Amino acid sequence: MELRISERKQAKIRIAMQGSAGSGKTYSSLLLAKGLTGGDYSKIAIIDTEHRSADLYAHLGKYNVVSMEAPFSPERYIEAIELCEKAGMDVIILDSISHCWDYLLDVHANMQGNSFIAWSKITPRQNKFVHKILNSSAHIIATMRVKQDYVLSQKNGKMIPEKVGLKAIQRNDLDFEFTIVFDIDQAHKAKVTKDRTGLFVSMPQFLIGPTTGIKIREWCCQNIRERRKEISIEIAKCTSLEALRHVYSKYPLLQKELKPIILEKKRELEKMYSQEIPNLNLIEQSKARQNGIDSNQ
């Protein structure tokens, strides 16, 4: 357990793309991911549950694809995410996570006995999946299909269903787990329904593109740049190898980036020590002669 100052670098972005079939969720996700990776498609992976639809956009770049077939269990999604993480992916697109919810609903429908007891067995599986999304080492973009939502209203003494818009096919409160939620219409335009970054709150509907991902990446990296400057100054002030080791161990998440600066400072300190040691030997020899001791005699 550790108390630390809040830093954006500690959290990867979690984005949800909601829309009906044909709205362009996969295409929009790929363009956004391009911006997040600085144009490097090789650092993007799609976990494809939509009958290999991810391959339709291969002309965009050489991104990676994990094709998933039924059953779409939470455990298989977790396994696919871990596969992408081990391969060093920066962005993982889950296309789509609605299949996971459909799978759990089917499992629940086929369970015998009390419905609440059945959900007590299913909910932990869903929670593990959500936990994996939130704690992944990569940026996550999750697409979700939507369906018409209804409410029952009383009219003339009768309960009549009324349309109240579209609803994502997933657990009701799942959108709370994401940093940004985009609703995409049939014209492929996005509207933000949740935005904890504040980047898109006041924007009208727009087409998602690489610049969208660039904005989000800049927001994520803003604090990192400031932190790097502070650490570089801290390294420059080190006067011993022990102090340098201490600085290096303080920032485990940045060690890969800090290594070249640390090694350069290490060489500088070692050179300084090598110059000091001969001078120290001369001083010791002078003292020995004054005491009537000469090592050359």
Please annotate each region the language model reported:
Residues 15, 36, 43, 54, ...:
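Intein modules and their embedded homing endonuclease domains
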Residues 1-19, 23, 34, 51-56, ...:
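Interfaces that engage single-stranded nucleic acids at replication/repair/recombination sites
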Residues 20, 131-214:
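Phosphate-binding/switch region of NTP-binding enzymes
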Residues 39-90:
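Nucleotide-state-sensitive switch-loop elements of NTP-binding domains
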Residues 28:
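Hydrophobic positions on the alpha1 helix immediately C-terminal to the Walker A/P-loop
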Residues 31-38:
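Walker A/P-loop NTP-binding motif
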Residues 94-124, 152, 159:
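Conserved P-loop NTPase nucleotide-binding/switch module
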Residues 14-16, 43, 90-93, 139-141:
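Residue-level preference for the first positions of well-ordered beta-strands
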